[in-house]
């Protein structure tokens, strides 16, 4: 049995904890608020600000974990190097977590060091720098914080008149203490995919069937698997994913995102060194091993006999229309559970924000079924659930 310190306790962390406990592991779930989803199923929990390096060190000293598994971006990541030197396994590695928590580090690694094709981009520390960069890139363009999650602070800017708002919105959505934005050209893509990539301690890099997804405001709204893409584009995406994960080092599951264009090919977008929100579709049994089981096996060094597509799947998120500190209630579960070949996951978040992701509907069907119809089904069912 290993003692695992989970940094971040959202819905992805909750599913990881469930997988870990099924393999007899001991998990301490951490987050900045009590009652977070993963805490509800963990052996122990800690509530503290993970951007506070001293608080993080105190928790590590208290629990003496064998493994540290980051689940969110807002962590004092430079401390992870020290923990790794002390013999604690950081997943997938301290280098990987440190690079990917900051869009500047990962974009420069991908574009400048590894030569991956990306959108043209600049950085801006002031509004004036943002205006200068926009003049070079042109409109429309995309403005994002260097550190954020779930699309927070991200905007599509269509004219110079919108830059001041984009600057303020970007800074307000930034996680951590970094006040710098990335501005990038808007790629006219036909689709975007997540390629779940598994790096192992002993074994080859593995890839899950590609996951298509739809975002709104930079935040995941639906995903489906397998995404139907050009085999040549898939091969190119796999080569890019293997290149960047190898450079970052370590064992675990990664969510590597790409833009696909019939005209211009494959563009690397970004990656997360952990299970991905769009990968929740694998909870519909689309694969022989879902993304959380794959992550756990890679972390523990357990064999992965291969990844097989078992059936098609689609997910659609359930959002909160309200903001409240009261524990949320849900209507419509009876209607949802009448549906065949459908799972409902309510994450158990103790309070709401407007558009906060509170649950997900997962639908599945046999291979070679109509994927578009399945996507429509998942969205229709998700709309039946009301958060109040």
Curated annotation (Swiss-Prot):
Q: Please name the pathway.
A: Purine metabolism; IMP biosynthesis via de novo pathway; N(2)-formyl-N(1)-(5-phospho-D-ribosyl)glycinamide from N(1)-(5-phospho-D-ribosyl)glycinamide (formate route): step 1/1
Root EC class = ligase
Domain ATP-grasp per the UniProt entry, residue ranges = 108-300
**Keyword annotations from UniProtKB, A to Z:** ATP-binding, Ligase, Magnesium, Metal-binding, Nucleotide-binding, Purine biosynthesis
Annotated N(1)-(5-phospho-beta-D-ribosyl)glycinamide binding lies at: 11-12, 71, 277, 349, 356-357
Q: Which InterPro entries match?
A: ATP-grasp (IPR011761), ATP-grasp_carboxylate-amine (IPR003135), ATP_grasp_subdomain_1 (IPR013815), PreATP-grasp_dom_sf (IPR016185), PurT (IPR005862), PurT/PurK_preATP-grasp (IPR054350), PurT_C (IPR048740), Rudment_hybrid_motif (IPR011054)
Can you quote a single GO CC term?
cytosol
EC numbers listed for it are: 6.3.1.21
Spell out the coiled coil positions from the record: none
Answer yes or no on keyword Ion transport: no
Q: Which reaction does it catalyse?
A: N(1)-(5-phospho-beta-D-ribosyl)glycinamide + formate + ATP = N(2)-formyl-N(1)-(5-phospho-beta-D-ribosyl)glycinamide + ADP + phosphate + H(+)
Instruction: Give the GO biological process terms.
Output: 'de novo' IMP biosynthetic process
Query: Where along the chain is Mg(2+) bound?
Result: 257, 270
Q: Which GO terms describe its molecular function?
A: ATP binding; magnesium ion binding; phosphoribosylglycinamide formyltransferase 2 activity; phosphoribosylglycinamide formyltransferase activity
Can the keyword rRNA-binding be found in this entry's annotation?
no
Q: Where does ATP bind?
A: 103, 144, 149-154, 184-187, 192
Similarity annotation: Belongs to the PurK/PurT family.
Protein task:
Involved in the de novo purine biosynthesis. Catalyzes the transfer of formate to 5-phospho-ribosyl-glycinamide (GAR), producing 5-phospho-ribosyl-N-formylglycinamide (FGAR). Formate is provided by PurU via hydrolysis of 10-formyl-tetrahydrofolate.
Annotated protein name in UniProt: Formate-dependent phosphoribosylglycinamide formyltransferase
Gene giving rise to this polypeptide = purT
């Amino acid at each position: 049995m290993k003692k695992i310190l989970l940094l971040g306790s959202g819905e992805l962390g909750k599913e990881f904890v469930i997988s870990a406990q099924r393999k007899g592991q001991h998990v301490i779930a951490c987050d900045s608020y009590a009652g977070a989803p993963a805490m509800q199923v963990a052996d122990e929990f800690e509530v503290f600000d993970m951007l506070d390096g001293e608080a993080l060190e105190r928790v590590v000293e208290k629990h003496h974990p064998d493994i540290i598994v980051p689940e969110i971006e807002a962590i004092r990541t430079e401390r992870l190097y020290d923990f790794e030197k002390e013999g604690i396994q950081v997943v997938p590695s301290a280098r990987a977590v440190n690079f990917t928590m900051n869009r500047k580090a990962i974009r420069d690694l991908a574009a400048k060091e590894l030569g991956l094709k990306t959108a043209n981009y600049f950085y801006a520390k002031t509004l004036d720098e943002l205006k200068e960069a926009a003049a070079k890139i042109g409109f429309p363009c995309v403005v994002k914080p260097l550190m954020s999650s779930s699309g927070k602070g991200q905007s599509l800017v269509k004219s110079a008149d919108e830059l001041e708002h984009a600057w303020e919105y970007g800074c307000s959505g930034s996680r951590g203490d970094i006040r710098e934005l990335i501005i990038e050209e808007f790629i006219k893509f036909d689709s975007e995919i997540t390629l779940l990539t598994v790096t192992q301690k002993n074994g080859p890099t593995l890839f899950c069937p590609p996951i298509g997804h739809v975002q709104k405001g930079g935040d995941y709204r639906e995903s489906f698997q397998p995404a139907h893409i050009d085999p040549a584009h898939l091969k190119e995406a796999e080569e890019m994913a293997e290149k960047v994960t190898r450079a970052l080092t370590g064992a675990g599951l990664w969510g590597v995102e790409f833009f696909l264009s019939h005209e211009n090919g494959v563009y690397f977008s970004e990656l997360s060194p952990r299970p991905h929100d769009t990968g929740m579709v694998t909870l519909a049994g689309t694969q022989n091993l879902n993304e959380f089981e794959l992550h756990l096996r890679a972390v523990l060094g357990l064999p992965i006999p291969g990844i097989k597509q078992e059936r098609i799947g689609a997910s659609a998120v359930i959002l909160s229309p309200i903001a409240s500190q009261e524990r949320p209630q849900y209507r419509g579960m009876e209607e949802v559970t009448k549906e065949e070949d459908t799972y409902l996951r309510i994450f158990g978040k103790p309070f709401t924000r407007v558009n906060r992701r509170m649950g997900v509907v997962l639908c599945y069907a046999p291979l070679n079924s109509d994927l578009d119809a399945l996507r429509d089904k998942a969205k229709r069912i998700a709309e039946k659930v009301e958060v109040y």
